[in-house]
From Swiss-Prot:
Role description: Sorting nexin, involved in the separation or division of vacuoles throughout the entire life cycle of the cells. Involved in retrieval of late-Golgi SNAREs from post-Golgi endosomes to the trans-Golgi network, for cytoplasm to vacuole transport (Cvt), and autophagy of large cargos including mitophagy, pexophagy and glycophagy.
Taxonomic path: Eukaryota, Fungi, Dikarya, Basidiomycota, Agaricomycotina
Name of the protein in its database record: Sorting nexin-4
Subcellular location: Cytoplasm, Cytosol; Preautophagosomal structure membrane; Endosome membrane
Keyword Membrane: yes
Biased composition (Low complexity): 37-48
GO MF terms, alphabetically ordered: phosphatidylinositol binding
Chain intervals for the UniProt region annotation (Disordered): 1-67
């Protein structure tokens, strides 16, 4: 267990009692052991009909995925259906925040992390450990390093303002952070690759977490083989470089994510404005209740009905505030978190584009070196060389002026170019295989993200709807009880 891999995991022997988690299931990818361990020449084992975390009966073959804009093919050969995403067989709960070393300068908040799972990689079906916020940060940072092709869920921000004001131990801030960490844990638990990571395994059940962290730091996954691309990337690849032949699948993925973010941002803006208006309305009802209480003191004959009416107004004001805190605020927090998750997915697609750009630029560089080598060979044999660029022409003229443009110099340059061409050919082959492997993994990651997005949107909208219905039902019941009392009021004119 020196690296964050899954060599000891039996993918095809899941217990039959485990509920299946349906998701796309192409043949096992090298990315399941981290991108560093990609071996393009290694054979891929066949996938079973159904194993833990996947449902192959609903997925198409990996070879069916083509360069097409068809959504079915782009998502790995099947339509994504959130109703089949059944990830409850691994449940992680972040709860019971507690202050540690209270009163000292080293005080921090720890959270109880309870895990229930039937995964065979866990020693116990139920474990409870305590982790602090920095432990979650450590987990995400190292998952990103070990699985660069995976969409690792974002971690909540540190909220610097609360650190400056000293409010990071307030109950409101701690609860808000706990909910954010709960979303992070849920996404990790439902991800069919990340939840099998050895680091996640240690995080969720190790009682010696500090030892496990140091062990993981001291035994990182093996680095990828050094290649020419590392030394040349800074030379000809920069922030302004663009992929010459964009893959239609990933172009549409990016556009789809951007449309989703734009739509969700609009919804978030509208709901946020509604929240502000509800706050204003609650304050108005509170002021009106005070006015009716004052009127009740003036009208001695109907003091009790007016006071009861004022109390119901206060109750309704409290009900509106309660709805904002328990329904609208969680919906806004959930939508903001989902926007961050989508942005993380887009960053992974950008990284895939960078892999393709590396391949394209290396190929172009190899072509230029081969052309120059052929030109020198033609000159050495006495034939007329092909037309050259301005830079090559100026260099040849300078060589002539220095007297270095002779047959021996050309042969030495050709010998060096032969070695560089061989090195570039190996680098181009590796870059091509890496780009293809990364692309296949991103296709699967997009399908996982679609399932997670649909599940989270369903839960958020369900909670939002239930909260609205509960508030309206409670308001109707309260007003129905007070209306008969108001109807019995008789005022002498």
């Amino acid at each position: 267990m020196d690296q964050d891999g899954f060599h000891s995991i039996a993918w095809d022997d899941a217990p039959s009692s485990n509920p299946p988690l349906s998701a796309p299931s192409p043949s096992q990818s090298p990315f399941e052991e981290g991108f560093e361990s990609i071996s393009p020449s290694s054979a891929q084992p066949p996938a079973s009909d159904q194993y833990e975390g996947y449902d192959n009966s609903k997925a198409g073959e990996a070879g069916d995925v083509g360069v097409t804009l068809d959504r079915r093919e782009r998502l790995g050969g099947h339509e994504v259906d959130g109703s089949v995403w059944n990830g409850k067989w691994m449940d992680v709960q972040v709860r019971e925040p507690a202050k540690e070393h209270e009163g000292s300068k080293d005080m921090y908040v720890s959270y109880a992390v309870k895990t229930e799972t039937s995964l065979p990689t866990f020693r116990k079906p139920l474990t409870v450990v305590r982790r602090r916020f920095q432990d979650f940060v450590f987990l995400r940072e190292h998952l990103v390093k070990n699985f660069p092709a995976c969409v690792v869920p974002p971690i909540p921000d540190k909220h610097r303002l609360e650190y400056i004001k000293g409010d990071r131990f307030s109950p409101e801030f701690v609860e808000r952070r706990r909910l954010d960490l709960q979303r992070f844990a849920d996404r990790i638990a439902r991800h069919p690759v990340l939840q099998r990571s050895q680091l996640v395994n240690d995080f969720l059940q190790s009682t010696e977490w500090s030892v496990a962290k140091h062990h993981h730091i001291s035994h990182p996954p093996p680095e990828s083989h050094a290649s020419l691309i590392d030394s040349l990337s800074d030379t000809f690849i920069n922030a302004f470089s663009r992929v010459r032949k964009p893959d239609a699948r990933f172009v549409e993925m990016t556009e789809e994510l951007e449309r989703f973010e734009e739509g969700l941002t609009g919804v978030e803006r509208v709901v946020g404005r509604g929240k502000s208006r509800v706050d204003d309305l609650a304050a108005d009802y509170q002021d009106m209740a005070a006015a009716y209480q004052g009127l009740g003191y003036l009208e001695s004959g109907i003091t009790e009905p007016l006071n009861r009416f004022a109390e119901k107004m206060l109750d309704f004001s409290t009900l509106l505030k309660h709805m904002n805190n328990t329904t609208i605020e969680p919906f806004l927090s959930s939508s903001h978190s989902l926007l961050s998750y989508s942005a993380t997915h887009r960053n992974v697609i950008k990284l895939r584009d960078q892999k393709q750009l590396d391949f394209e630029e290396l190929s172009a560089y190899l072509s230029a070196i081969v052309s120059e080598r052929d030109r020198l060979a033609a000159l050495s044999s006495g034939h007329t060389a092909a037309p050259v660029g301005l830079g090559t022409y100026l260099r040849d003229q300078m060589d002539k002026l220095r007297g270095t443009d002779d047959i021996h110099t050309r042969r030495e340059r050709m010998r060096k170019m032969d070695g560089k061409i061989k090195e570039l050919q190996d680098a181009v082959t590796l870059a091509h295989e890496t780009s293809n492997a990364f692309s296949e993994e991103v296709i699967k990651e997009h399908a996982y993200f679609e399932l997670e997005k649909k599940q989270e949107m369903k839960d958020a909208l369900q909670a939002y709807t239930d909260g609205q219905v509960e508030m309206l039902q409670q308001a109707m019941d309260d007003w129905d009880r007070i209306i008969p009392l108001l109807q019995r009021i008789r005022v002498d004119v």
